[in-house]
Amino acid sequence: MRQDLTGTPRFFRLTQGYPGRAHSAVNTLHRSVLLEETIVGLQVHPGGLYLDATVGLGGHSEAILRTESTRVVALDQDEDALAQARLRLAPFGERVRFEHINFAEFEPGEERFDGIVADLGVSSMQLDSPERGFSWRFESPLDMRMDGGGEAETAADLVNTCSAEQLSDLFWRYGEERFSRRIARRIVERRPLRTTTELAAVVASAIPTRQPIHPATRVFQALRIAVNGEVAALETFLERSPDWLVPGGRLAVISFHSLEDRPVKHRWRADPRLEVLTRKTITAGEAEIQSNPRARSARLRLARRLSPSEESRS
């Protein structure tokens, strides 16, 4: 369902991109979903300061920066994505500042923002990079770390060391996989597993063949969420981010599955600092879905930071 929450006329088309060779190369890799709806929902205005908590390849930041004198603080824990965003947003110079950090660990200091956007989940660039191990479509090591390195556990570590009970719980909790027990037992029988294709084949062998999606999709999602601590990071962000806004400032969060959307919905409803602006989630129209299939599962929620006087009356 598409909603116009502001009464604003249809926003100018944002999909043409900022002119320049660097941008066009990046833009072929990734198109930000619900871009127009996000910018309208944030009520981006000249001179505003905005936080892009998951800059990715820079699509939402670029759209914000097209408004005169706006500034953006752009965060990402993925160094590769941050490097691409730097290229894309280079024409905006000092109006954008980059930080290599997970949004749950961000410290704004004295800065307060007119709007915050977080586009959750994995970007198309990450999914299409074989060496990252996020997708069953490519032969690669079972890594799945968003930061691309460090000492954190990899997906291979979890697959090869967790008990069948632990794996089953992980696949059910983070992937909502109804065949979690069967898959976990088969993995324990066949391990060690070192590559994405090995894991995908083992999962496929454990469950019925007729599935609406690839049989390994939910298992890969669950492992990615566990490896990167995504649930805990999102909970921390949802708790802290309202305090980063000026009174009247807006939050926009785009999620791609219920494990992301559910905490946003319930946290915001219970938060006395916020007014929820979206009774139902905003979803992509058919035209966007046709041009960008990733948009089909995207859900946008919006909230507004209450002023102290509004909080006292609520």
Curated annotation (Swiss-Prot):
Give the matching HAMAP family.
16SrRNA_methyltr_H
Which protein family is named in the record?
Belongs to the methyltransferase superfamily. RsmH family.
Q: Does the keyword Transferase apply?
A: yes
Spell out the subcellular localization from the entry. Cytoplasm
**GO molecular function terms attached to this record:** rRNA (cytosine-N4-)-methyltransferase activity
Q: Which organism does this sequence originate in?
A: Gloeobacter violaceus (strain ATCC 29082 / PCC 7421)
Q: Which CDD domains is this protein grouped with?
A: AdoMet_MTases
Primary subcellular site in the record, as a coarse category = cytoplasm
GO aspect biological process, one term = rRNA base methylation
Task: Give the EC number(s) listed in the UniProt record.
Answer: 2.1.1.199
Q: Answer yes or no on keyword Cytoplasm.
A: yes
Q: Where does S-adenosyl-L-methionine bind?
A: 58-60, 76, 103, 119, 126
Could you name the Gene Ontology cellular component terms for this entry? cytoplasm
Protein's recorded name: Ribosomal RNA small subunit methyltransferase H
Q: Which InterPro entries match?
A: RsmH, SAM-dep_MeTrfase_MraW_recog, SAM-dependent_MTases_sf
